[in-house]
UniProtKB/Swiss-Prot annotation:
GO terms for molecular function: structural constituent of ribosome. Belongs to the bacterial ribosomal protein bL32 family. It comes from Cereibacter sphaeroides (strain ATCC 17025 / ATH 2.4.3) (Rhodobacter sphaeroides). One of its GO terms (biological process) is translation. It holds the Pfam family Ribosomal_L32p. This is Large ribosomal subunit protein bL32.
């Protein structure tokens, strides 16, 4: 089993962890429908990318209403 040869100081430990921080999402507004979407990705609400429809979006069905 691996055992540390020398103690890792607080400074060296923290410098190693300096790149581990999470980066917040940077959503952009879809120019077609106005929903928030990830930059350089197809809009999940309307299926448009770069002012063109690339994915045909079907109407969502509510499963709770069908069961009742």
């Amino acid at each position: 089993m691996a055992v540390p040869q020398n103690r890792v100081t607080r400074s060296r430990r923290n410098m190693r962890r300096s790149h581990d921080a999470l980066v917040a999402a940077n959503p952009a507004e879809c120019p077609n429908c106005g929903e928030l979407k990830r930059p350089h990705h197809v809009c999940g609400a309307c299926g448009h990318y770069d002012s063109r429809e690339v994915v045909a979006v079907t109407a969502e069905t509510d499963l709770d209403e069908d069961a009742a």
